[in-house]
Amino acid sequence: MKNSGSCLIIGGGMAGLMAATVLKRHGLDVTVLDKGRGIGGRLATRRLTYSEEIEGVFDYGAQYFTVSDAVGTLRDREFQGWVDEWLAEGVITEWSQGFFQESGSFKSSNKPCYRGTKSNRSLAQYLAQSLTVHTNAQVTRLSWQDDHWQVQSQTGEFFQGDRLILTPPVPQSLTLLDHSDIAINPEIRQKLEQVTYYPCITMLALMEKPSQIPAPGGLWGSGHPLGWIACNYQKGISTKGYAVTLQAGPEFSQNYWDQDNAEIAQQLLKAADSWLSSKVLDYQIHRWRYSQVAVSYGEPCLVLTEPGPLILAGDGFLAPKIEGAVLSGLAAARSLLPLR
């Protein structure tokens, strides 16, 4: 059954893109606004060009995703249905069913670890290709006027919609609501304020020679300081350069958050020396303030009706990682479909 009406979605990560995809399939006019230069949120991919012959491609946010059996069997089947669709379309592929650990032992995931076929961001780009998406759209204010939401961006643009979904990290959504003078029930707000995230400092290192990371190209660290190392060349997305992603653990990321990039790079390269043993041609440092959920809201999404139809969603609500973001976005879409 087709629905009339429109919906604005703030945030172009997986929660926002999945909500937008479902709502559009049900006939709503959907607009996605994202503050970044590219779509995907933590499905993030970046290129480092060293020369005409050498270019590294890095997945530097989420490294892969799985379909777990811990979130709820009905919802898992729903997510698996989407995964099957993406596999059939060739958008994603299985990377592995586990990775080696820093200790040298292999840790099985007991389930497929999926990745984007071209890159992890390519999944987000696939979803976005049929949607109306505005990037570089930093939203600064929300208002409910004449039975619709009006959203203003930092550049002065205005967007309107009958419904509104917020999918940024919870602290950012709360800040936006505060700046917009939109009040939330004190008990609900207190629960939202308890949602917390681990930070993650990530290094993108373009190496002169192949890494020593064991196949299939991922390695779990102890978290002190490295939590994860990935060889994007082995992963199959960086064919013209030996691109290595190094992700620090939460404690290191917190302690070194304000340190300069050179000091961070020195520490992470020292920790990874056994698996690199090669000259670094170029590198970048990226800081993920809201990398992974530490304490979640405990519900798939938050549905509010005042001052107008407003949904808060994202991985901070149901469960961490890509799966949690997807399931939250699907729940957000379902909650709005009865509002015809």
Residue ranges of model-derived segments:
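N-terminal FAD cofactor-binding segment of flavoenzymes
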Residues: V22, A44-S96
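Flavin (FAD/FMN) cofactor-binding core of flavoprotein oxidoreductases
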Residues: Q266-G308
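Glycine-rich FAD pyrophosphate-binding loop
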Residues: L8, T21-S51
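A conserved short coil-to-beta-strand element within the FAD-binding core of flavoproteins
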Residues: T135-Q150
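Active-site substrate-recognition segment that forms the wall
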Residues: T202-N255, Q267-W275
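Short beta-strand to alpha-helix junction loop
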Residues: V67-S68, L74, F100-Y126, D258-I264
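Core beta-strand elements of the Rossmann-like FAD/NAD(P) dinucleotide-binding domain
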Residues: N3-G5, Q154-R163
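Central helical "cap/lid" subdomain
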Residues: G40, E53-E55, D162-P216, S278
